[in-house]
Amino acid sequence: MQVSLKNGKVTTLPKVNTIADGTAVKTPGSKIFPYLQKNLDDVITVEDEDLVVAFLDMVENHKMIVENSGLLTVAALKQLNVKDKRIVSILSGGNMDVITMSSVVQQGLILRDRIFTVSVLLPDKPGELCRVCLLYTSPSPRDA
């Protein structure tokens, strides 16, 4: 929508890549566009990283599952100076599969330096996993 508003006409994007899949449209609706063009003051865009943080905040602090598209307003608020102001943010949608939810939580924890992930490909032979464990428990990798 932001590109269409900037261009002054409905514009089709070549691709849309976001975790907010409920709002990921290549071509904005032709019926809503003139209304928004006339009445909208500003458009705020948020990065997927902002949505990940907003999702984790909702889960941890408010015990709510809200899909990424429904969190756009929460993520956008972080870009505005709204401290000590009354704000209404509509949260919607819980249409999120368990795999996506797990991935978003893991990304959020990584962004906050609360966990890290290591992937290792090992030969399928006895003792290989033990060698990797020794690397993590040794004071120096050379000792392993």
Predicted regions span which residues?
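Glycine-rich phosphate/pyrophosphate-binding loop at beta-loop-alpha junctions
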Residues: 1-38, 78-123
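Active-site-adjacent helical/loop segments in soluble small-molecule enzymes
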Residues: 29-85
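Short, conserved charged micro-motifs
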Residues: 127-131
